From Swiss-Prot:
Record's protein name: Fimbrial-like protein FimF
GO biological process: cell adhesion involved in single-species biofilm formation
Record lineage: Bacteria, Pseudomonadati, Pseudomonadota, Gammaproteobacteria, Enterobacterales
Organism: Salmonella typhimurium (strain LT2 / SGSC1412 / ATCC 700720)
Compartments, as annotated in UniProt: Fimbrium
Annotated Pfam families: Fimbrial (PF00419)
Positions of disulphide bridges: C41-C81
Domain of life: Bacteria
Alphabetized InterPro entries for the sequence: Adhesion_dom_fimbrial (IPR000259), Adhesion_dom_fimbrial_sf (IPR036937), Adhesion_dom_sf (IPR008966), Bact_Fimbrial_Adh_Pro (IPR050263)
Amino acid sequence: MILRRVFIAIGCVLFSPLSQANSSLGEVNIELRGNVVDFTCAVVAGDSNKSVNLGTWPTKQLHAAGDATQPVAFSLKLEGCPPGSASITFSGTPAPGTALLALADTAMAQKLAIEIRDGDQRRLPLEQASKAVDIDNNGNATLKFYANYIALADGVQPGLANADATFLINYN
């Protein structure tokens, strides 16, 4: 008899409108999305650990904030890509308050950063995808970029000016 009352009590609670009420307290909705592809692009062997020499520049070339050196062209060649287009997103440590690439060490040149530009020589901020390039019928694509030094403030101080960036291939 007691067992029967327990089942009735549990049934009343389970089917009660209060137990069915939606509460947003402590509720979190997460939506996960992605794609699975048959194959991905590969970076041509010589481009996977690319070194771009930006040259040696006098500080008078970088006298005032915003002054920049001559851009140096470089490209990233992809092969074995799926049909469509590809773009590149560069990542790295940003210079304070900018989307420019910070130098690798604070003991290096001062008040200086590295600007990455797209194939049209427009600034390409870190963490922003470049303009997409069509992949040819053989699955190849070449994406062209430029890089240069840029003064963050007046009075750039001399020294080594190296930085590291990584890139992500985006498929479109």
